[in-house]
């Protein structure tokens, strides 16, 4: 099923595909048990390659900055995390501040899972 289309026909799935390897790499470096989507986005932006990828992703979507970031925070990054075997979705993180989407809680898989 074709998803939402950005400018020039780019899809959420295409942008997620481009970010997946970086997301997986960052997940392997995380410590702790749980994090929210916005916490992960903050981590993503804390490294130069992540900052460049984040900016490239919302710009590639092609709408105004706020609308494009809504797609990245609410669809692309959650899709990356759902695709990963390194984390599981644990529910919405109501009360967590993210001006672009309702963040979720994610649990890191134990090394034996």
Task: Pin down the residues of each PLM region.
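Phospho-regulated, low-complexity intrinsically disordered regions of nuclear gene-regulatory
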Residues: 2-26, 38, 43-113
């Amino acid at each position: 099923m074709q998803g939402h289309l950005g400018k020039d026909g780019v899809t959420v799935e295409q942008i997620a595909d481009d970010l997946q390897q970086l997301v997986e790499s960052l997940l392997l470096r995380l410590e702790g048990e749980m994090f929210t989507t916005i916490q992960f986005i903050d981590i993503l932006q804390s490294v130069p390659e992540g900052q460049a990828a984040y900016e490239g992703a919302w710009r590639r979507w092609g709408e105004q900055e706020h609308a494009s970031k809504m797609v990245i925070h609410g669809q692309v990054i959650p899709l990356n995390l759902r695709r990963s075997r390194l984390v599981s979705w644990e529910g919405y993180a109501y009360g967590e501040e993210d001006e672009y989407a309702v963040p979720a809680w994610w649990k890191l898989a134990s090394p034996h899972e």
